[in-house]
């Protein structure tokens, strides 16, 4: 056994599947003082629900799903509201400690609010963390093939630990099983129905739950929609985001005169790196020693794709402006950090690989990649990494349109390249009782909930069964980083 595996065994003994003799459906609740990241405390309950790891296996392990329940402040509370984090791999409990804590508290006027840790995440057991640290070779020009091989090598270590040593059935970690977890949670809570409050991958899970258990869902909020066939991103959506961003940059009074054609600037920098990669010396934060890092087109494409549609987008003009002047220090430092980060979550890889893509979408991505600036880098390291994880594909029926009478509130941002407005509009067709809030200028994640108090107002109206009075909301304009001319 390698030293890495020995160490993981010691650190993660508490993350094992629940003993087989414990009964499926067992719910444990205890009083819990919840504390957020600011030190604010609120009385709550900590819950743990035992469910099968793989429902189709009569000899399945039991696993434990963790959640925190914030009791309703209403005298006549409605169905519980279950928060579904994104990722996949995000923690609902962890999310509640952060910037969305006031929103968790506000929704209590509707019903109990449950911060839920999906199977394999957060406080749920096992938490399928992969602690293998990447070691991308620095003396070789970075490429998709080189990076995938390093990721696959580390994936093998994580798979060996969880599957072979801890006897976890990784094939049980898919969105269908997670949807059935929510049905089991509803039953354990004694609720006739639950409402779902979701974002990003959480909407992928919410849609699957509404397909599998439509009668169990009272209402659903989907922010940043990722439909059943949206796991793989379309290059055309990413390109449209860059075009929208370029228009904002051109109109910006601070930087527009220096960057009148952002797409042209991006292309010129990519072409330069394609023809002549740059070697940059930066300090390794771990060793405090200077190392040489190769920055080429792949590196810069990946950095952009990894951050596109987030608040980091505001740094893109300065990044490319400096690069056009020959300064590649920032991308070199970022790539060094990426090349030494931990692998991530086995749950995340298994979920995305199982959800997969239809042949139609795969062909569309391949076709569009040839005509767009970032090509198909937004999906890296998928689908190649799935060859290592070997997650059973959920099939095209899973990826087909969802049709249900559940009332749904979609929330989208015009600058969200990860889960664009078109995703929500595509799936709204299956929900005749739906509303769509569009936030002008909002990127992915927090801004979909927090960029305006009107968003919370709309959510509360929707959960009360009232018409949503404002469906067009303006977020604060993006503040671009200064160009730092020399």
What are these regions (language model features)?
Residues 21-294, 350-425, 429-486:
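Gly/Pro-rich cap/lid or specificity-loop segments adjacent to the active site
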Residues 16-20:
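Sec/Tat signal peptide C-region and signal peptidase I cleavage site
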Residues 244-248, 299-304, 315-318:
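A general alpha-helix detector
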Residues 8-15:
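Bacterial N-terminal signal peptides
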Residues 321, 325-363:
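Long, low-complexity segments enriched in small/aliphatic residues
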Residues 284-302, 309-311, 339-346:
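Structural motif
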Residues 1-8:
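Bacterial N-terminal signal peptides that target proteins for export
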Residues 306-321, 358-363, 394:
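Short helix-capping/linker segments at secondary-structure and domain boundaries
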């Amino acid at each position: 056994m390698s030293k890495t595996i020995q160490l993981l065994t010691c650190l993660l003994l508490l993350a094992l599947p629940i003993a087989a003799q414990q009964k499926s459906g067992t719910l444990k609740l205890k009083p819990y003082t919840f504390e957020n990241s600011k030190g604010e405390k609120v009385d709550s309950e900590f819950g743990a629900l035992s469910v099968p790891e793989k429902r189709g296996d009569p000899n399945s392990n039991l696993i434990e799903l963790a959640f925190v329940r914030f009791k309703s402040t209403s005298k006549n509370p409605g169905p519980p509201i279950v928060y579904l984090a994104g990722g996949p791999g995000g923690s609902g409990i962890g999310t509640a400690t952060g910037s969305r804590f006031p929103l968790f508290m506000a929704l209590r006027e509707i019903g109990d609010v449950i911060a839920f840790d999906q199977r394999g995440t957060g406080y749920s057991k096992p938490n399928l963390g992969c602690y293998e640290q990447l070691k991308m070779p620095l003396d070789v020009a970075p490429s998709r093939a080189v990076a995938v091989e390093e990721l696959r090598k580390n994936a093998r270590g994580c798979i060996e630990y969880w599957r072979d040593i801890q006897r976890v059935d990784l094939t049980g970690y898919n969105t269908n099983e997670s949807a059935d977890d929510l049905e089991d949670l509803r039953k354990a809570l004694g609720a006739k129905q639950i409402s779902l409050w979701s974002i990003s991958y959480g909407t992928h899970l919410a849609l699957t739950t509404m397909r599998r258990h439509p009668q169990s869902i009272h209402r659903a909020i989907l922010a940043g929609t990722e439909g059943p066939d949206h796991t793989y991103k379309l290059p055309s959506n990413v390109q449209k985001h860059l075009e929208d961003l370029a228009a904002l940059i051109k109109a910006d009074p601070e930087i527009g005169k220096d960057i009148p054609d952002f797409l042209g600037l991006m292309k010129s920098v990519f072409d330069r790196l394609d023809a002549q990669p740059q070697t940059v010396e930066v300090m390794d934060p771990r060793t405090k020693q200077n190392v040489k890092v190769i920055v080429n087109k792949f590196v810069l494409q990946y950095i952009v794709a990894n951050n596109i549609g987030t608040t980091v987008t505001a740094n893109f003009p300065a990044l490319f402006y400096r690069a056009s002047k020959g300064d590649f220090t920032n991308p070199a430092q970022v790539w060094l950090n990426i090349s030494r980060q931990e692998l991530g979550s086995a749950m995340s890889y298994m979920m995305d690989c199982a959800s997969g893509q239809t042949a139609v979408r795969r062909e569309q991505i391949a076709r569009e990649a040839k005509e767009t600036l970032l090509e198909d880098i937004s999906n890296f390291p998928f689908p190649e990494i799935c060859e290592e994880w070997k997650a059973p594909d959920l099939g095209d029926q899973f990826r087909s349109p969802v049709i249900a009478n559940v009332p749904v509130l979609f929330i989208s941002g015009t600058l969200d390249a990860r889960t664009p407005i078109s995703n929500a509009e595509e799936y709204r067709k299956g929900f005749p009782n739906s509303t769509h809030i569009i936030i002008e200028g909002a990127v992915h994640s927090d801004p979909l909930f927090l960029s305006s108090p009107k968003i919370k107002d709309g959510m509360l109206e929707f959960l009360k069964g009232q018409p949503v009075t404002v469906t067009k909301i303006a977020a604060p304009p993006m503040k671009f980083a200064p160009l730092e001319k020399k």
